[in-house]
Amino acid sequence: MIDENLIHKALANPFRREILSWLKTPKQCFVQGYGDPGCGVPLNAIHARSRLSQSTVSAHVAVLIEAGLLVSTRVGQWMLLARNEEVIHAFATQISLHL
C-alpha cells in the first residue's frame, strides 16, 4: 500500500519532480552510458546534473526513496537510482479515482 501523504509531500518540491522527470528518460538526460538501463542512474550523475551540493541532492533523494517513488540499488561503491513505476502508477490511479 502506498502512503499518499508522503508522496504528496515528496512531489511538493520542484527539484524532486525534476529528478523523477530525469529518471523517466535517463538516456536523454544523462550523457554517459551506465551499462544495464534496468539498474538505474548513479546518484553522482544526478548530483552532477543538478549542480546542487551533494548533501542537498542526497536529502532530496532520501525523501523520494522514503515515499517509495525511487528504488535504490547499491553496486559496489555506486548507489543506482530508478523510478518505482509500480508506485507511481498506483499513485496516479488513486489521484484519478479520488479527484
Language-model segments: residues:
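Short, hydrophobic-biased segments on the C-terminal half of alpha helices
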Residues: 61-62
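Short, Lys/Arg-enriched N-terminal segment that forms or immediately precedes the first helix
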Residues: 1-8
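Short, charged/polar, Gly/Pro-enriched secondary-structure boundary elements
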Residues: 87-91
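Beta-hairpin "wing" of winged helix-turn-helix
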Residues: 66-75, 82
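The C-terminal cap of the DNA-recognition helix in HTH/winged-HTH DNA-binding domains
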Residues: 48, 65-66
